[in-house]
A protein has these predicted regions:
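Outer-membrane beta-barrel porins/channels
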Residues: 1-178
């Protein structure tokens, strides 16, 4: 025969998990439908969120505590060039060439120290996909180098390859029926 006993304490916290408020603004300059330069700023308000934590040091039960996270800022700068975005130019003149950089602050702490800041550089191109009724969709290919680092923490370098499709169809086009 086997017997067992257990002592279980249950703690519950209402509204324990929340998502941060996110605000952003951006500007883009378009020169002659060939050159585009854009800047974007995003702020995520992680610092105002409570997070359920257990204080093992003082043997306190689970409670919502502030100051676990920090507000996160991200700055992006991007550039695009396309010689002939719309038209019947040669294939290479219709390709969209892109490059960008970004910088982001962390939203979390590791052992009381700010987490890693992130810097990235990317470059890529958009290959036009054309058929009889659509000339605006693209196959997008890019490479991105990302460096994450923080004081007294691991430093990380990574390279990402991104492949995606952009379908710029006329979804709400008014068709004439005869």
């Amino acid at each position: 025969a086997q017997t067992s006993t257990s002592d279980t304490l249950a703690f519950s916290i209402n509204n324990a998990y929340e998502l941060p408020t996110m605000m952003g603004a951006g500007l883009m300059w378009n020169h002659n439908h060939q050159w585009k330069v854009g800047f974007d700023y995003t702020l995520q308000k992680w610092g105002s969120l409570g997070y359920p934590t257990y204080d093992a040091k003082n043997n306190e039960p689970w409670a919502l505590r502030d100051g676990v996270y920090m507000d996160r800022s991200k700055f992006n700068l991007g550039f695009q060039y396309c010689y002939a975005e719309n038209g019947r130019a040669s294939f290479l003149k219709r390709v969209h060439y892109r490059a960008g950089v970004s910088y982001a602050t962390p939203y979390y702490k590791v052992n009381g120290v700010d987490g890693p800041k992130e810097i990235s550089v990317s470059a890529g191109f958009g290959i036009p996909i054309m058929n009889g009724y659509n000339n605006r969709s693209q196959l997008n290919i890019s490479g991105q180098w990302v460096k994450s680092s923080a004081k007294d923490l691991i430093k990380e370098n990574s390279f990402r390859i991104n492949i995606g499709f952009t379908f710029n169809e006329d979804w709400f086009k008014k068709w004439k029926m005869q």
